[in-house]
Amino acid sequence: MAASQRPSWSESKVAGVVQEGNREAPQDIKMALYKHGQLIPSLGDAKFRSPIISEIIEKKFEHYRNDKTLNIHGTLVFGTSSSLSGIMANLVFRNSFKVKYEALKTYASLTTLPVLATIVSYKLFVTDALQSGDISKESCVLRSALIGMACGVSYPSALAFYKNGRLAVKYQTVPLPPKGRVMLHWLLLCQTGMKAMAIPLFFQIVMGAFTGLHHYNICEKPRARLVPDD
């Protein structure tokens, strides 16, 4: 009889702790389970949420890697289009000046320099501004279009005009200009080629605007995820 009245070891061990089964927990334990009106998660809930949090973080990093890859690929495509524009400019001005010498040298410079100019300019004026968040959508599209026009058409055209003009004078493939009309003479020689460059000009402006808009939307995705819905 005395043995039945004596509390068991397990009951005495969990005194002050939430009791098992249908037995109700003490009042102080109930109050301790609540903090600022919210139930404190148990150890089981924490273990359950831990893989979920890890999965969410992993998905965030995966989205970041995908967005960064798309950004790099878009910039490289934009630079490649400037390179193609430089090749076309070199071809047009070589035909205008009737130059058939040093083709590899001129094509190498007209292929690589516009790419580098486009990528560096886009990095300085668009990508850095997007990462800092100090640029609007309209400004981003405008800057990208101007970079396409300047680095994708104007710079390759001026470079091709200069290099092939020097070769034309060096090898005397065209008549030398009279005194006082040097610039007019060269412009008349290559006016057909300058008109042909209107095609890559339009293409580079559209390409730049599309690239800027695309990268703006990519950079706005993470910010939109951080803003809670009303």
From Swiss-Prot:
Source superkingdom: Eukaryota
Ranges in coiled-coil conformation: none
Regions crossing the membrane: 70-92, 107-126, 139-161, 196-218
GO annotation, cellular component aspect: mitochondrial membrane
Primary residence: mitochondrion
Pfam families: TMEM126
InterPro entries, alphabetized: TMEM126
GO biological process, one term: response to food
Intracellular or extracellular location(s): Mitochondrion membrane
The entry's keywords: Chaperone, Membrane, Mitochondrion, Transmembrane, Transmembrane helix
Membrane topology field: Multi-pass membrane protein
Family stated for the protein in its record: Belongs to the TMEM126 family.
Binding partners and assembly: Part of the mitochondrial complex I assembly/MCIA complex that comprises at least the core subunits TMEM126B, NDUFAF1, ECSIT and ACAD9 and complement subunits such as COA1 and TMEM186. Associates with the intermediate 370 kDa subcomplex of incompletely assembled complex I. Interacts with TMEM70.
Task of the protein: As part of the MCIA complex, involved in the assembly of the mitochondrial complex I. Participates in constructing the membrane arm of complex I.
Protein name: Complex I assembly factor TMEM126B, mitochondrial
Organism, as annotated: Mus musculus (Mouse)
